[in-house]
């Protein structure tokens, strides 16, 4: 039976029995020894621990979900994921470095430290955080869905996807580069910035955006269904699927290249430009197109029905 206050020797014995992990989830343990080093993961989910010891080092992941812990030690080091979801944590220490994902969902944290480093995902959904520090760097995905953040910081770098669904954010920074997907469904954004580069998918469904910038680059799929887009820029290059279903687009631009399917179902488009290039199928069900030029480059099939 575990004691409520573990010694280093007791912790080391438990870790030796569990391949380096220390699993105290839902346990009655109330304190950990100073200077504790966990070579694997430290699981404290739903435990009785109210404070972390000084000098705590976790080589793997640290799970503090549903704990009463309010503060993290200044010298905390986490090699992989840090889960604070639904914990009582009120603030983050300066110089906090998280090698993997940082989940702050459903916490009372109101701000992030200026020098925060997150190597994986940063989850801020359902938090009270209203602003992000300048030059924030997120190695993978940044989730802001249903957060109170109204503005993106200068120098923001997102290596993966940026999720702004149903946020109050009204504008994006010029030359914003998103390595993964950019989700804007239901957001307040009305215009896309110059120099926007999206390595993955771009979704503008249920937004008030009416046009796309001339230099827009989308590496994978572009979803425009249920958007207010009326016109596409000349020379638009979409690496994957271009979804124009039920949009207000009535004309395709010259130089349009679509690497995947081009979906014109339910649109007012009547003609296909001679230089259109499609990597896969051309979907024309319920469209106004009656003729496709013979020299149109189509890698797949033309589907009328």
Regions found by a protein language model. Give the residues of each.
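Charge-rich, low-hydrophobicity low-complexity segments
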Residues: 1-12, 17, 51, 145, ...
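Hydrophobic anchor residues at the C-terminal helix/turn of individual leucine-rich repeat
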Residues: 35-36, 53-56, 75-76, 96, ...
């Amino acid at each position: 039976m575990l004691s409520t206050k573990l010694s280093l020797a007791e912790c080391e014995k438990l870790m030796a029995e569990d391949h380096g992990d220390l699993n105290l989830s839902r346990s009655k343990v109330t304190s950990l020894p100073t200077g504790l080093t966990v070579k694997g993961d430290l699981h404290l989910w739903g435990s009785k621990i109210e404070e972390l010891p000084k000098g705590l080092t976790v080589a793997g992941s640290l799970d503090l979900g549903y704990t009463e812990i309010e503060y993290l030690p200044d010298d905390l080091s986490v090699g992989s994921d840090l889960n604070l979801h639904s914990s009582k944590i009120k603030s983050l220490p300066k110089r906090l470095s998280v090698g993997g994902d940082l989940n702050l969902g459903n916490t009372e944290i109101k701000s992030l430290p200026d020098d925060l480093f997150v190597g994986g995902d940063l989850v801020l959904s359902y938090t009270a955080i209203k602003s992000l520090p300048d030059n924030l760097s997120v190695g993978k995905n940044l989730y802001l869905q249903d957060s109170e953040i109204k503005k993106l910081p200068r120098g923001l770098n997102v290596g993966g996807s940026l999720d702004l669904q149903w946020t109050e954010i009204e504008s994006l920074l010029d030359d914003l580069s998103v390595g993964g997907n950019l989700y804007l469904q239901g957001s307040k954004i009305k215009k896309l910035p110059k120099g926007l580069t999206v390595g993955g998918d771009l979704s503008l469904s249920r937004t008030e955006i009416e046009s796309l910038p001339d230099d827009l680059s989308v590496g994978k799929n572009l979803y425009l269904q249920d958007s207010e887009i009326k016109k596409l820029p000349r020379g638009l290059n979409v690496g994957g699927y271009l979804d124009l279903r039920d949009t207000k687009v009535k004309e395709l631009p010259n130089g349009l290249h679509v690497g995947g399917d081009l979906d014109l179902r339910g649109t007012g488009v009547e003609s296909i430009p001679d230089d259109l290039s499609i990597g896969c199928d051309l979907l024309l069900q319920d469209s106004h197109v009656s003729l496709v030029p013979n020299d149109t480059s189509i890698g797949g099939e033309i589907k009328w029905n």
